[in-house]
Amino acid sequence: MKITVGIPAYNEEKNIAGIISRVKKYADSIIVCDDGSNDLTSEISEQLGAIVIKHSKNKGYGAAINSLFLKAKELESDVFLTFDADGQHRIEDIPVVSDPIIKNRVDVAIGSRFLDTKSEEMPNYRKVGIKIITKITNLSIKEKLTDSQSGFRAYSKKALQEITPSDEGMGVSTEILIKASNLELKIAEVPIKVNYDGDTSTHDPVSHGTSVILSTIKFTSIHNPLKFYGIPGIIFLIIGLIFVAWTIQIYAETQEIITNVSLIGIGSVVLGTILLITAVILFSIVTVVNSKK
């Protein structure tokens, strides 16, 4: 069974040597995608025997993941793991994450930072952001996950062949899960521990969080338009009709129109109608696209 570990990296010359040296124990091949680094990440990786994919410029985390997926497919990997280069993931957890794939229990195994309550404490702002994003993601998949944004994952050969990531940003984590769920691939989580010693993140937390949330909403709304737009549309339509009926009742009794009540009613009806139309149109488009795949 061929196990491949893919590592997206951006200016990680301080960490990459130690990670590659220790990952070799668990992998038949290691792929490093250098996403436009201006340090020695590529050179160090090549010297240590890793297969290096080098982007000419920084394209984003999703672009790096996509390049790693393509190379792992080319290598005909039986198990493909993604592992961050920032030093947060523990290399000794690789067998834990890959085990469900090796034993053919699931197609996508996610290393969750929230299943092990004894794991080191995550910064509160990250914990809140990840939980919000995970709740949004769970609207579009069958499984109820605790950590949809973990970059420590393992994929079966089937998942590797059938999933093609397209998002070039941090939204790729959500995109992969939604595509896996739509393809009826089995997804499960396993507990991992994470190191939060020092500031290992290379992203501004506000812009990073906003980008991920917007990407998550985008993929959720596209893949489940009836749920995402249809349910709010029905709610607004019902509220609007109640207020319109109330306006009519008041007018019948007093011959007066209460402006605030009528505006709320009309506005809610219009908004509800727009959301329902959007849901139907998007659902039709998605259905046609899926039927042609």
Model-derived segments and their meaning:
Residues 12-15, 37, 90:
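Donor nucleotide-sugar binding loop of glycosyltransferases
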